[in-house]
């Protein structure tokens, strides 16, 4: 018994007879872990054998009681040298396990504790009845039971459960007997109770009124019971149980109303042991309001019965009682002015690595009273804009930084080179084997070397070294060296001196020499021996530069490639000899290929300019000190992503040096070079490196814990020593030492979310590399990386002493924060590019077009509108935005394409006049194209100018033109006209790339960038990660817990991208780094466009963003124009035939039954979906204005369903009068008599879904104003239901395009179908489409049946849409031809009379490139055989076979070799 253990036994007053027993003879305390914050002590004991059960219980009880008196919690485990597997001892400990958490859960204990155990075939066997859920046991309880037996001293047991038939029968018989007895007893008790009740009852005649039952008293008692009830951890519930009480946080709520008017609240709660689904019913609205506390984020106590939900098949609590409880968040307990500053924190913008939003990080720091907090995401600054805004709001300083990947520009092949002929040199090629990767914490166990001259080994050195302790299994497995190899080995210092003598006058050579040389120098330094000064060649870097085409340059792959023997890789003597053989191959190739003859040439002539791509990455934290530093930071991020990206963004050291002004550098985490030097090279080397930085980072010991598992550091004491060494490095280098937390999530319980995210990366990620080998190998655990308070951080560093801990945790971090100046990350103004005379040009173009249409002088209504808009546009610097858009549209028009507008730009009459949009926002009006006479209808009686009746000009008799959609300008630039315009344009998909290049041409390559986006983990993706984690790590979560974990893991950055049409334009008097860094989308360095590093929304109020989107409508219009020669601009918007499509099918010459729909909407943009077709069937629109209403209703949220649809059905309103588009609200209210400002404000509140979110006082003010002006109540109620509304200008642009397409469907049908299939159809099945009506209808019926059963694939759903159009075309008398090898186009459908000939790409599996190749090949000559079609046409065997089956190839032979018989004919 050790002295320390004996002292402990004295303190707990362990009985002497037990202390003197053989079990305690060699007892010792291996380690005691003290957690000062939680007041938890963990004892780790060593005993000669597993303790008798009575002794164990005595030790356990006395330890607990003794330390409880000091308010200290105790846990302990035992390592036993010998294990007794006798049945009695195992049975006793098995039952003891159920007295310890988490095995002591009620359900587990009651179901399993009485089972019998035995030890057979090296397994602990549990005999159980067959109705026990074996899978549930394995997933939920087996891991806990294994851990508990390990803590008892049995080591890692294999535990299995088997079904016992005898026990099953016995328990079944007992259950039946018990149930019968209970029923019998219940009946008897009931009879006796009835008799007693009758005996107690007074005579009837003397009966008095029964006392009233006191429901209030009963409710009070029930409530009191609820308040005092025992809280059950959710993890313990495994079966249906009654009157269970949970406490936890609500993370999901859904409220539903049944058809009977009852309400159900489905919600999910977690107590962080697990999660649970719950239900609460409310009979009416009044009762529902009592449960408003059931809200996301609320902490509740609930009581109810656990039952299996019949729909979800999972356990659900039916809640009976619920109350809100106070949850005590962690607090920073240090006084004001004595709180730390966190300087190393990651947000969810650290790709697949961290969880908190920058807002939550800053809010937490502010809540704790910290004066500042730093943001240091991995290699990016995408959280800066949000962090900037949030910090200003929270009143806290944000320190903007990042954790960078620093690399050396050129990694040398040779260290300390001298002028020496490589051919005449003597080389000592050496290798070392060690017990780990840390020169400071691990030991040398072998040094071996081959002295070589001109390719021959002239002398060898091979010595083992005894480290003074047994080798770990990992070391033996890796190196092949066992303890037997080390028996009788020489002392380390003797071997070191001998090796130094062996190396004299030679060039040292090693593979990955930085490791071997570093290890040797650290050991030389430790024994006061001179360090290596002679030249060194690193064959790893030699190979990388000499053979850059090879993917792998490790010793194993290189020896295989060059056929060099390597029989025992990782034993130093074999590795050294193999490396020597490779060296002389490299020297020969370097001489022959590159003329390398001298040692000095290796670094100057052979090291590649891009050797940084293979250089080892070192982490460093970089912080913005001032505004100059911010711009330099943006430049560094850009260069690392654009010029130096290789796997990850890299910053070469010289690039960092060139941009270091205004920046401060920290040494970062264990992946930083200073920390690495302390581990692998020694303090002296670390001091030299530390001088480059502005401060030294140290982190809580828990952050470094994975290094212990990876055997880089021995134990907790080793971690603490490394931290002391880092402090010593700072002292010697005269650099402050700062304690940082390496934050990756905020709360300790969020650790599991990061675990799930990180493990989803798979074993290819460095962080997931396994420890050891084999099936059971697991990655190192992730560190405890939550956001720590000041007091928690001081506890972590308590081992340094109070004063030093305070200095590194508080004082130094505050001092650093004080060095940081306030910077402007996001600018406060809009900076538009400069185009010479933009203002004059916009005004000139506007008036020029207005005079052309409306005459000069202009009508007052036109003149005033132009003046109003130009005042806003020119006065706020928006002219350049208008002019740039006009230039882009004009260029596309010149290439023969129409450009459609999106959004609210059609609300601007200036935009209409200069050609940005076709939508005219003026009130409905007539205008004469000859004399410019005009008439305006301003009373709101007409919804659209296109609906005005045709009539001639009263002045000259020319037919009037009709226009005007009555849209206020305010809906585009705001009521005051100062909102930054967002001009979205729909270019043809074919012309979109050219339009993008136009932006570069207009503004310059260095000023035009694609708008960047950030892609995060979606909740569905996170769900998959959780299920994968369950599978890979043997977990089992109930459904609610999976949902919680998925929600927690969602939102983390996964990738970057680009807006499909957004282009950001930087003003040409500034540069992009004034606003944002730049990068390639999704790290694709081959991309033709660079993107903004920031999400474009973060800077959209600072720079011009042009939305140049690709759309099918302009492409289809161009196709129809090419086919027909009709200018789409001349197509009338009020064509009667087109309008007839919305009321029936007669205009198409078919019946509804033939085409399966009552109207002609199939294939018409905006109106062809099932949803909108249903709306058309219900509303029967007859005017353009009503079509606008339909467009608005179909695109809005809660505008049609449950709102306008009901109003129309009930006859309260009509399609014309319901609220359809956002702009209609303002126009309608102004016509009703409301002031424009109030009408505008009401519109804004409604369209954004804010009507019910604004204060009751504000809302009532609007309601009163509307009622005073006779706005009906149904209209007001409709406003309250709306969540989102579509802009009328957007609807007008879309409807106008749709009507043009519909015009061709009515009047030029074969051209319409040709264009539709060429451009809009997504899926084809040529065999069906060419098979006639019966084949088409049969296939549609087949897909319909699949849809009903939810079995249809996405391709089949797309195919159904195509077949609807094919069916309609065939029913109208047109034909669908077969693919023709010599007539079909590569990608376009062809018209041959009344028949459509499909293109090659319509054949499933045949892509555009092959289609074009076939067309090109047939132009060169006829295909004589299938083999020739494959060879010249590039078609695969499968495609050729498919063509043959469809009869496309006719009698084409397999090959064009003449048979013997052909000569006779």
UniProtKB/Swiss-Prot annotation:
Disulfide bonds: none
GO CC entries: cytoplasm
Pfam short name (any one): DNA_pol3_a_NI
Domain Exonuclease: 427-583
Coiled-coil segments: none
One record GO biological process: DNA-templated DNA replication
Keyword Disulfide bond in record: no
E.C. numbers: 2.7.7.7
Record keywords, A-Z: Cytoplasm, DNA replication, DNA-directed DNA polymerase, Exonuclease, Hydrolase, Nuclease, Nucleotidyltransferase, Transferase
Keyword hit for Oxidoreductase: no
SMART domains reported for this sequence: EXOIII, POLIIIAc
Subcellular location field: Cytoplasm
Similarity-based family: Belongs to the DNA polymerase type-C family. PolC subfamily.
Protein name, entry field: DNA polymerase III PolC-type
Organism field: Streptococcus pyogenes serotype M18 (strain MGAS8232)
Taxonomic lineage: Bacteria, Bacillati, Bacillota, Bacilli, Lactobacillales
